[in-house]
Amino acid sequence: MAERKYFGTDGVRGKVGTFPITPDFALKLGWAAGKVLATQGSRTVLIGKDTRISGYMLESALEAGLAAAGLSAAFTGPMPTPAIAYLTRTFRAEAGIVISASHNPYYDNGIKFFSAQGTKLPDDVEEAIEAMLDEPMDCVESAELGRASRINDAVGRYIEFCKGTFPAHLSLENYKIVVDCAHGATYHIAPNVMRELGAEVIEIGAKPNGLNINEKCGATDIKALQEKVLEVKADVGLAYDGDGDRLIMVDHLGNKVDGDQVLFIIAREALRAGHLKGGVVGTLMSNMSLELALKQLGIPFVRANVGDRYVLEKMQEKGWLLGGENSGHIIILDKNTTGDGIIASLAVLSAMVQHNLSLNELASAVPLFPQVLINVRFAGGDNPLESAAVKAVAAEVEKRLAGKGRILLRKSGTEPLIRVMVECEDGALAQQCAEQIADVVRAN
């Protein structure tokens, strides 16, 4: 695979007004994508966005570029990333474009593409778009220019799709649910899905103004959700991130239920129903208690690198249907082609209703081990992880943990940092071991 000049692991992302998140680059990117995709078949591309104010600027620039290349754009308005994956498939569009920086602050944004199948673009198509970006821009004849249209029923279509994943014989009647939409793309969808399934819904983080996405709310900051759940005596709280591909839950006692626990609940329910194909994919950061809990059920578990892209790649490699991260990316491939916060929350809620159990009771099967993370800065040059002393102390700590914990030493890909993570049932022991390793890393 050729080295990427513009595309990262999740499309193009950065600070608005700074290359590559500028109107002129978005125009050129739309044109380059249009030139490549025009040779593929259909001549319409879906464009969705989250609620950042810069989305207006970027969608207009992308549409102009696509039109110049002869492709039409169909706008969905604010829409979760997984909704664009779904709608691209059902509209039989040539591709889907999402304008979002996920859980980042409002002043960041990004542009990523879905294929006609609602999956990541094939490498050869991405490489062709990159090559086209370095070509001079041209314009098709006037009669061949693309058009722009708006999909007025996109929200309703996705709401019905989400509801369709919830068992028809079950209802959320008598459940009080607090929904935190992070002032993001789920604000007009998630609360309505829950209401239409019978729940009493209290909304927070559902008044986007273009500048407040992910600000002290959503999956990356659940304090407000925890307080609201306790205040209104709700059964459960749901927190999504800005583009709706992450889910963190809160039980009726105000406790956080993270992606690892959500993943286990869904896996156990799929096993009971006979729907679990193969095993579960987690990441290097997945809590050891998840691995042990799955093992008790006889469910295979493997770890991918951190990042939902790598989880998905491992799932496809193994032919498995379920994977996720402790940060709340949950991928259920027999329901959608990418991580989907609303779909994941409905899977957990259906387990609660089916067995008449609280979220606290369901999550108690995975009592998370304390994780201690220490970042150690080094002076560049040799990688401390290659030193004999670091390898020796790592081996010593592994032996001390005796299979009841684990260590993870990683070199940052962006800074001169070594990340030291120790995890075990005994939090004090984890802290002690992490500091022991960090001291040796600093000395080397």
Curated annotation (Swiss-Prot):
It catalyses: alpha-D-glucosamine 1-phosphate = D-glucosamine 6-phosphate. The active site is at residue 102. Its cofactor is Mg(2+). GO terms for molecular function: magnesium ion binding; phosphoglucosamine mutase activity; phosphomannomutase activity. Binds 1 Mg(2+) ion per subunit. Mg(2+) binds at residues 102, 241, 243, 245. Keywords: Isomerase, Magnesium, Metal-binding, Phosphoprotein. It is an enzyme of class 5 (isomerase). InterPro entries: A-D-PHexomutase_a/b/a-I (IPR005844), A-D-PHexomutase_a/b/a-I/II/III (IPR016055), A-D-PHexomutase_a/b/a-II (IPR005845), A-D-PHexomutase_a/b/a-III (IPR005846), A-D-PHexomutase_C (IPR005843), A-D-PHexomutase_C_sf (IPR036900), A-D-PHexomutase_CS (IPR016066), Alpha-D-phosphohexomutase_SF (IPR005841). Catalyzes the conversion of glucosamine-6-phosphate to glucosamine-1-phosphate. This is Phosphoglucosamine mutase. It comes from Pasteurella multocida (strain Pm70).
